[in-house]
Curated annotation (Swiss-Prot):
Belongs to the tRNA nucleotidyltransferase/poly(A) polymerase family. Bacterial CCA-adding enzyme type 1 subfamily. Comprises two domains: an N-terminal domain containing the nucleotidyltransferase activity and a C-terminal HD domain associated with both phosphodiesterase and phosphatase activities. SUPFAM superfamilies: Nucleotidyltransferase (SSF81301), Poly A polymerase C-terminal region-like (SSF81891). This is Multifunctional CCA protein. Its EC number is 2.7.7.72, 3.1.3.-, 3.1.4.-. Keywords: ATP-binding, Hydrolase, Magnesium, Metal-binding, Multifunctional enzyme, Nickel, Nucleotide-binding, Nucleotidyltransferase, RNA repair, RNA-binding, Transferase, tRNA processing. Its cofactor is Mg(2+); Ni(2+). CTP binds at G8, R11, R91, R137, R140.
C-alpha cells in the first residue's frame, strides 16, 4: 500500500498558495484493508475513506470509463492493480494531475509543473470531453487564478467549444451549474468565469439572459465601453473589489439584464429595463435554483439601481418608499448591499473606475436618519393599528427631509 497527496494541495503548494483541503490516493489496497486500518468508508459509487484521526479523504486509485451521457455517466474501476499514473490520467487539468509521495517527491506524468510555470490550464487527455462539468470547472479555475496570469490552452478551449456545440452542457443539472457558478463568484476575478463561458459558447446555453447583453448598445456619453455585456462584466469586476459578499456580486451580475429585451428601435436608450429585468432575474434564478435571498436582492437591484443614481433629486417621500420597497426595516443589510451594487454599476465603466459615488453615502445616511425615528414615541402618542404605520412613515419622511435639506440639497432648488 502506498499513499500519495494529490491534486489541489500539491498544485497550490507549488504555487506558494495556502493549502486548504488535502486529498489522498491509496495505491495497492483493497476496501477491506482500509477498513481494517481504521478508515471509515463514505463513498457509495467508488471507495473513498476518511482517515480515523484527520478525517481527510483517502480514495483508492481508480479509473473511469464513459458509460452514459452527462457528468454522471461513468463506470469506475478501483482495485489494487490501478497505478497512480492511471488514476492521475482521469483528472481534468494537468495542474491537477500532480502527486507527492512521503519523501516529498513530485510525481508528474502529464507535465503539470511545466504548465504551472507557463500559467496554462491544459486538459490531461481527450477524456476531458466526456464530462461537461469540466467546462465550468476550467472557467472557474481561470477566474480563480486570473491574478496569477493563467490562461486556457488553445487546444483546451477548442475542446470546450466542441463540447458545448455537441450539446453536452445540456446534461448538467441546475444544482451543479449553480454550485460551480457560486464558487466562481467568490473568486478574486469572477468576471473571468463568465468571459470564458462566453468564449466557448457556454454562456448562451447556461446564462442566455447575460449572453443576450453582448452587442446591446448603451449611450456612449454614459457608457464609453458602449456594449452592455462588456459593462456587465466590468461591473462584476468592480463589485468583487468592493465586496466579498456573494449576494452583492450576483445582484451586480444581474443588474442590467432587462436591457436585452428593451425595444431595439429605442436603442441605445433602455427605458423601463428595470421591471423587465426583474422578470428575467426571476426566470434565471428559478431555472438554476438560486437561493431565495440572492434572488430577492438581485430583483431589487434590477428594479432600483437607476433610482439610486438619481438620489440628489429624490423627494424624501420617495426615499422612505424605497426603504419600504426593499424591506429595509426588517432586512437593514440590504441598504448597504444596494449601495455597493449601485456604486459598482457607476464605476464599472471605461474611465470611471476611480470615480466617487456620493449617492451611496447619501443612501446610507438617509437610512440611518429614517430608522432612528422611534416607534415607541408614536405608540405612546396614542396612535393605534394602521395609524402607527402611517404616523411613523410621516415622521420618517420629515426626518429625511430635514437631513436632506442640510446634507444633500436638491440641485434644482
Amino acid at each position: 500500500m502506498k499513499i500519495y497527496l494529490v491534486g489541489g494541495a500539491v498544485r497550490d503548494a507549488l504555487l506558494g498558495l495556502p493549502v486548504k483541503d488535502k486529498d489522498w490516493v491509496v495505491v495497492g489496497a483493497t476496501p477491506q484493508e482500509m477498513l481494517d486500518a481504521g478508515y471509515q468508508q463514505v463513498g457509495r459509487d467508488f471507495p473513498v475513506f476518511l482517515h480515523p484521526q484527520t478525517h481527510e479523504e483517502y480514495a483508492l486509485a481508480r479509473t473511469e470509463r464513459k458509460s452514459g451521457s452527462g457528468y454522471t455517466g461513468f463506470t469506475c474501476y478501483a482495485a489494487p492493480d490501478v497505478t497512480l499514473e492511471a488514476d492521475l490520467q482521469r483528472r481534468d487539468l494537468t495542474i491537477n494531475a500532480l502527486a507527492r509521495d512521503d519523501d516529498g517527491q513530485i510525481i508528474d506524468p502529464y507535465h503539470g509543473r511545466r504548465d504551472l510555470e507557463a500559467r496554462l490550464l491544459r486538459h490531461v487527455s481527450p477524456a476531458f470531453g466526456e464530462d461537461p462539468l469540466r467546462v465550468l470547472r476550467v472557467a472557474r479555475f481561470a477566474a480563480r487564478y486570473a491574478h496569477l496570469s493563467f490562461r486556457i490552452a488553445d487546444e483546451t478551449l477548442t475542446l470546450m467549444r466542441e463540447m458545448t456545440a455537441a450539446g453536452e452542457l445540456e446534461h448538467l443539472t441546475p444544482e451543479r451549474v449553480w454550485k460551480e457558478t457560486e464558487n466562481a463568484l467568490t473568486t478574486r476575478n469572477p468576471q473571468v468565469y463568465f468571459q470564458v463561458l462566453r468564449d466557448c459558447g457556454a454562456l448562451r446555453v447556461l446564462f442566455p439572459e447575460i449572453d443576450a447583453l453582448f452587442g446591446v448598445p448603451a449611450p456612449a456619453k454614459w457608457h464609453p465601453e458602449i456594449d452592455t455585456g462588456v459593462h456587465t462584466l466590468m461591473t462584476l469586476s468592480m463589485a468583487a473589489m468592493l465586496s466579498p459578499q456573494l449576494d452583492v456580486r450576483f445582484a451586480t451580475l444581474c443588474h442590467d439584464v432587462g436591457k436585452g429585451l428593451t425595444p431595439k428601435n429605442l436603442w441605445p436608450r433602455h427605458h423601463g429595463h428595470g421591471p423587465v429585468g426583474v422578470k428575467l432575474v426571476e426566470q434565471l434564478c428559478q431555472r438554476l435554483r438560486v437561493p431565495n435571498d440572492l434572488r430577492d436582492l438581485a430583483k431589487l437591484v434590477a428594479a432600483y439601481h437607476d433610482l439610486i443614481h438619481t438620489f440628489p433629486i429624490l423627494q424624501p417621500k420617495t426615499i422612505v418608499k424605497l426603504f419600504d420597497a426593499i424591506d429595509a426595516w426588517r432586512k437593514p443589510q440590504r441598504v448597504e448591499q444596494i449601495a455597493l451594487t449601485s456604486e459598482a454599476d457607476v464605476r464599472g465603466r471605461t474611465g470611471f473606475e476611480a470615480s466617487d459615488y456620493p449617492q451611496g453615502r447619501w443612501l446610507r445616511e438617509a437610512w440611518q436618519v429614517a430608522q432612528a425615528v422611534p416607534t415607541k414615541e408614536v405608540v405612546e402618542a396614542g396612535f393605534k393599528g394602521i395609524e402607527i404605520r402611517e404616523e411613523l412613515t410621516k415622521r420618517r419622511i420629515a426626518a429625511v427631509a430635514n437631513w436632506k435639506e442640510k446634507r444633500c440639497p436638491n440641485p434644482a432648488s
